[in-house]
Amino acid sequence: MCKVLNVSRSSYYSWLRRSPSKHSLENRELFYLIKRIYELSKRTYGSPRVTIELHKRGFHVSRQRVARLMKSQNLKSIIRKKWVITTYSRHNYPVVENKLNRDFNTTRPEQVWVSDITYIKTLQGWLYLTVIIDLFDRKVIGWSFSRSLKAAHTSIPAWKMAVRNRMITRKLIFHSDRGIQYACHEFANLLSSYNLVERSMSRKGDCWDNAVAESFFKTLKVEHIYHHSYKTIKEAELSVFEYIETWYNVNRIHTAIKTSIKDKKEKFINQLVA
């Protein structure tokens, strides 16, 4: 080996005994934290979210360095899959114009809520999940499980949960697609009883008008649902409930707001009382 490297035997053994460099030690400590954050995210975080979490913990490191360390140990975010649009809008109920117009930026809670419905497969049949999300902090503030697609079992109970969780005290835009659950008289009349609520609907066949809600379902399925095979409806309900209430709504980093939902709300409250 010494002949190949063209160095003396003493120099070679001196190199072997040499202590790791400061940079190597930093990388070792950094990688330990990166791996810990990656595992806590259930292998869903890529370098952007891992970097945000490191910054929160006081480690000011570039995303490029995090990406290199993750790549060196083959730490990859779960591959994302395409999602299926499941809106049924072939009905005769009146629809409203798109007042949101893809403006997903808000300055306070209870300014814009978005909603959508998705399907979850189980061996007992389909389970339908309806969610309502506050655009300010991306929190799922209302949701409902059902075996039926009627508004009484989807949009209406999700709305009732949302208004229990967050009081409407100022003008609120409620945005959804044109699905029958949002256009029907039962749901329209319910929202009209709230004077501060203004309805908004996506343009026909345009999923990007409701991109935040669509993105949530994509995240839910890629990070969680696709890794489970649900035998029963109850099993699926419990699994999705735990994902929303113990991970997504609490600790998950959201790149759109560059923090977790909990931290975003706390920062807003601190600004109000400052």
Region locations from a protein language model:
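Basic, flexible linker segments flanking DNA-binding modules
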Residues: 2, 9-108, 261-270
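Generic alpha-helical secondary structure signal
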Residues: 4-11, 29, 95, 154, ...
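Conserved, non-catalytic sequence blocks in retroelement Pol enzymes and Pol-derived host proteins
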Residues: 21-24, 58-60, 88, 104-106, ...
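An active-site-proximal beta-strand-loop segment
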Residues: 102, 106-141, 148-149
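Active-site beta-loop-alpha junctions of metal-dependent nucleic acid enzymes
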Residues: 144-167, 183
